[in-house]
Amino acid sequence: MGQKVHPNGIRLGIVKPWNSTWYANTKEFADNLDSDFKVRQFLIKELAKASVSRIVIERPAKSIRVTIHTARPGIVIGKKGEDVEKLRKVVANIAGVPAQINIAEVRKPELDAKLVADSITSQLERRVMFRRAMKRAVQNAMRLGAKGIKVEVSGRLGGAEIARTEWYREGRVPLHTLRADIDYNTSEAHTTYGVIGVKVWIFKGEILGGMAAVEQPEPAAQPKKQQRKGRK
């Protein structure tokens, strides 16, 4: 059987950035990695209802900077920033260095693979029919400008005795094209019949220029200069 490489892993450094960006010597590397894992575990558990897409960790000069990408920044920040301050203290305690937490808003959650997968799992846990949940996610993504989307669910679908896999695709999802901006993520729905796995691939277009094009902000549109016609 043909196996697929992880769509995010194969594109790291080409069109996808890392979720942890720091350098460490051999002695500190394992501790930093363990600290990153614990910080992510804590934040994902604490912000389960805040629609968190991804958590980026940086370590500038004996400190830790955590950027939380979320579709609901108000829930993360809390009243007058109280909730985010509590998170900052716990993260600093886990990492053992001063912590800073930044919040980045996800403008279009329908085009974020993690948020789409979480949305489908929450619907499956509320006993919504899996085909309806899949179709709704695909339609919303295509309506908001996705070039292609594929959704796959696996498990005891509809309470069936034998587990199976079903998928639904619309548009293009070119997994072999390295410059293709493909957002991939997974989630799990814990139902009364067992666990149902959800996978989502979203193709947003091709990125020309590699990581340099990803990291550079889009230039602001400049007004066109009107040319004066001279007399002949």
Curated annotation (Swiss-Prot):
Molecular functions per Gene Ontology: mRNA binding; rRNA binding; structural constituent of ribosome
Domain annotation KH type-2: ranges: 39-107
One of the GO biological process terms: translation
Pfam families (alphabetical): KH_2, Ribosomal_S3_C
An annotated GO cellular component: cytosolic small ribosomal subunit
Alphabetical keyword list: Ribonucleoprotein, Ribosomal protein, RNA-binding, rRNA-binding
Superkingdom of origin: Bacteria
Function text: Binds the lower part of the 30S subunit head. Binds mRNA in the 70S ribosome, positioning it for translation.
Family stated for the protein in its record: Belongs to the universal ribosomal protein uS3 family.
SUBUNIT field: Part of the 30S ribosomal subunit. Forms a tight complex with proteins S10 and S14.
Protein name: Small ribosomal subunit protein uS3
Species the sequence originates in: Serratia proteamaculans (strain 568)
Gene: rpsC
